[in-house]
Amino acid sequence: MTIAQGDVWWADLPEARGSAPGFRRPVVVVQGDALNRSRLATVVCVALTSNLKWATAPGNVSLPANVTGLGKESVANVSQLITLGKTDLTERAGKLARSKLELVLSGIDVALGR
């Protein structure tokens, strides 16, 4: 399986607890490709949601359906960084354009207070 930064994948997440994302949901890979190509068994992702009310939260990025390959508009919720096992990524849906990926990465900086 080839995983690249900017890929949109369906992932099998553990059961949700509190506000954490859970179950099967789309994610975008934000981990750099040097690590993605390494023997490291994990990958850092940002959870996507179809709940458009999150589009106005600081740093979050609205992603039109044609950008993600998911069939409906989504929001990259940058406050929900998730480290997953590479085997948790089950189905590749698409790949973000570099311009959208840069917005997500900038949003992570906002979430981290950078």
What are these regions (language model features)?
Residues M1-R114:
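Conserved functional hotspots at enzyme active or ligand-binding sites that engage polyanionic ligands
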